[in-house]
Amino acid sequence: MFYTVIWIFCATLLAILFGGVRKPKRFPPGPAWYPIVGSALQVSQLRCRLGMFCKVIDVFARQYVNPYGFYGLKIGKDKVVIAYTNDAISEMMTNEDIDGRPDGIFYRLRTFNSRLGVLLTDGEMWVEQRRFILRHLKNFGFARSGMMDIVHNEATCLLQDLKDKVLKSGGKQTRIEMHDLTSVYVLNTLWCMLSGRRYEPGSPEITQLLETFFELFKNIDMVGALFSHFPLLRFIAPNFSGYNGFVESHRSLYTFMSKEIELHRLTYKNYDEPRDLMDSYLRAQDEGNDEKGMFSDQSLLAICLDMFLAGSETTNKSLGFCFMHLVLQPEIQERAFQEIKEVVGLERIPEWSRDRTKLPYCEAITLEAVRMFMLHTFGIPHRAVCDTRLSGYEIPKDTMVIACFRGMLINPVDFPDPESFNPDRYLFDGHLKLPEAFNPFGFGRHRCMGDLLGRQNLFMFTTTVLQNFKMVAIPGQVPEEVPLEGATAAVKPYDIMLVAREQ
């Protein structure tokens, strides 16, 4: 009996260890799978050498050449398929069989061990939450003229704060940190609609919030974290695996948001109409029609977190790439300034609805900034909800499928000299014309619902700064073009001299 048990144990162990090394039939090409780790060792070695996960996919694209742009990995327990080209990304994002979001410890831990919110949910929960958000945010400016007013106000506040800093330094120029230059103002454009409040730069509360965001995004990526691929590590090495940091970051974020929700709970009944999305959500709870429990306090917290992450983080990072490249290429600053001066003048700041179409070079700058940011970035992961196919490859149920926008946006056919920052690539006879492969906001039902707000923020903050200031590199402290890796790529912190233009 004893030997029988030992034999069964050993056979089971071998099945676990070696059963996972066999790739599913017709799985997309990629590196070999090893027991327990899958292809994580190959990925890790290349990542250490190249610095970024997206560049690892560049290597695989050259090594495992196929005409479809799909590449297969296994990281720990997770099967992962990377969509690398424009056609591949379009196919995976419009395939209803791959319309799910991943499930597991990483995705549940962030939302109270449940699948809540709108960013990483699917099915009925995603449909109901997304519908509610879009319907009610429109009442508070989202996707309407009111949104332009909110963004215009924040751009005006940014301008005044920068002018005050220059004035305190003598009125001509000042040294400023470019890290998080616009973070508070961008966050305010969304937070005004969520909670009816805006924050001032430098307030301890918002400073702590932004630091928490920075740490969270620095220590994870879109595919997950070490503890999500190897769940046992959260018990064995909670710090090394990123588990403790992940939990603490979310605890801090939810503490901040819970305070705001409780303030709304105490006051929202004093008003005949909801003031913001939080009021609308609390009123929906009062109606008592939530038989499926989709409108809980935890769901509201998850939505606030998702809107924070999706709405402000990507815009801020794009602005970071924009300003870095403008500092490195002052001739682009001057050309944009001349366009603004001729079209808008210097008496008022540019406006989205009034001036955007007349400022094609300025808009081209923002488009190129988005490209430079997104070519270092992965999309939010999808999940195969059933066994399915992509370009003839077999994709098993629950496989994670994720877009690597780098392959799409660094394609030299659509983007000649793709590593260079060149707004002229979008201009033809003085008019904007987007390359066919320029699709950084995604496709299908999961296309970014905040793309309009993001584009308005980029345009307004960039043109407002360029109209009023020169951004000059400090000798010996030129910004580094190699970004920091994380859930989204970020420009490394640097300082500049901000020089006021003569009005």
UniProtKB/Swiss-Prot annotation:
Membrane topology: Peripheral membrane protein
Top EC category: oxidoreductase
One Pfam match: p450
Binding positions for heme per the UniProt entry: 448
UniProt keyword list: Endoplasmic reticulum, Heme, Iron, Membrane, Metal-binding, Microsome, Monooxygenase, Oxidoreductase
Location in or out of the cell: Endoplasmic reticulum membrane; Microsome membrane
Keyword Metal-binding: yes
Family listed: Belongs to the cytochrome P450 family.
The protein, known as: Probable cytochrome P450 303a1
Gene this protein is translated from: Cyp303a1
